[in-house]
């Protein structure tokens, strides 16, 4: 069974080496259970620091995208090292990532193209592999509005089209934020990708082999 795991930069963070070790162990256990895994790593706080400094220096937005992608690839190399993949080649496109997973059973990558978030890249790879997508984030699932707002309600299940609608609505709202960005939500909806949105704590306690089968406390997105 193929599975794609999107890890936010808050998970693979150079300031939290123990979390990187734990993440690698969870992924190794998933591989040992027979899963074939592609991991897509975000840039997180490190990318934001570089981008903020560069933006203040007047750097064009396209180059800022490239800087962010470079950081995600460094994070991918770091996680690959934690997995013992010392000859790791970081794929540069979703097609290449899918090809490596089919051949080797595992791949670790970061961003690929300017304007494409790592969650969107993960969704593209999941579509190619026809496997479930797991998004590990800093909230415990998808909410009907910003979780910090009073009355916000966690959604246990929803359809891909509903996810896309929520993501677009959050983007249009001033200061709004959503656990899945609009581009990734669009990719999930287009490909009708079974998606599990879980917190890091849930991911750690349940293990990947349980999460991909819906045994978690997060949100399941399925058509």
Swiss-Prot record:
Residues annotated as binding ATP: 9-10, 44, 48, 137-138, 143, 146
PANTHER family with a match to the protein in the record: URIDYLATE KINASE (PTHR42833), URIDYLATE KINASE PUMPKIN, CHLOROPLASTIC (PTHR42833:SF4)
Activity control note: Inhibited by UTP.
Role this protein plays: Catalyzes the reversible phosphorylation of UMP to UDP.
Family: Belongs to the UMP kinase family.
Subunit structure: Homohexamer.
Enzymatic reactions: UMP + ATP = UDP + ADP
GO MF annotation terms: ATP binding; UMP kinase activity
Domain of life from the UniProt record: Archaea
Pathway(s) annotated for this protein in UniProt: Pyrimidine metabolism; CTP biosynthesis via de novo pathway; UDP from UMP (UMPK route): step 1/1
Organism: Methanopyrus kandleri (strain AV19 / DSM 6324 / JCM 9639 / NBRC 100938)
Enzyme class: transferase
Binding site for UMP: 43, 65, 112-118
Listed GO CC annotations: cytoplasm
Keywords assigned by UniProt, alphabetized: ATP-binding, Cytoplasm, Kinase, Nucleotide-binding, Pyrimidine biosynthesis, Transferase
Lineage: Archaea, Methanobacteriati, Methanobacteriota, Methanomada group, Methanopyri
InterPro entries: AceGlu_kinase-like_sf, Asp/Glu/Uridylate_kinase, Uridylate_kinase, Uridylate_kinase_arch/spir
HAMAP family, A to Z: PyrH_A
Protein localization: Cytoplasm
Entry's EC annotation: 2.7.4.22
Name the record gives this protein: Uridylate kinase
SUPFAM superfamilies: Carbamate kinase-like
GO biological process: 'de novo' CTP biosynthetic process; UDP biosynthetic process
């Amino acid at each position: 069974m193929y599975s794609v795991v999107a890890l936010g930069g808050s998970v693979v963070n150079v300031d939290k080496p123990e979390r990187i070790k734990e993440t690698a162990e969870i992924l190794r256990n998933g591989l040992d259970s027979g899963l074939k895994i592609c991991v897509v790593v975000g840039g997180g706080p490190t990318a934001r620091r570089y981008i903020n400094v560069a933006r203040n220096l007047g750097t064009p937005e396209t180059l800022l995208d490239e800087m962010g992608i470079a950081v995600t690839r460094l994070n991918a190399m770091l996680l690959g090292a934690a997995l013992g993949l010392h000859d790791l080649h970081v794929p540069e496109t979703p097609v290449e990532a899918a090809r490596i997973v089919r051949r080797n059973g595992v791949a670790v990558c970061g961003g690929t193209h300017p304007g494409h978030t790592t969650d969107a890249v993960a969704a593209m790879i999941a579509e190619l592999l026809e496997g479930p997508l797991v998004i590990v984030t800093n909230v415990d699932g998808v909410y009907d509005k910003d979780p910090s707002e009073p009355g916000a309600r966690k959604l246990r299940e929803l359809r891909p089209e509903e996810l896309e609608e929520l993501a677009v609505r959050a983007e249009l709202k001033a200061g709004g934020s959503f656990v899945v960005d609009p581009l990734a939500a669009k990719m999930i909806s287009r490909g009708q990708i079974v998606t599990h949105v879980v917190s890091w704590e849930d991911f750690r306690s349940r293990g990947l082999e349980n999460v991909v089968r819906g045994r978690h406390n997060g949100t399941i997105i399925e058509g």
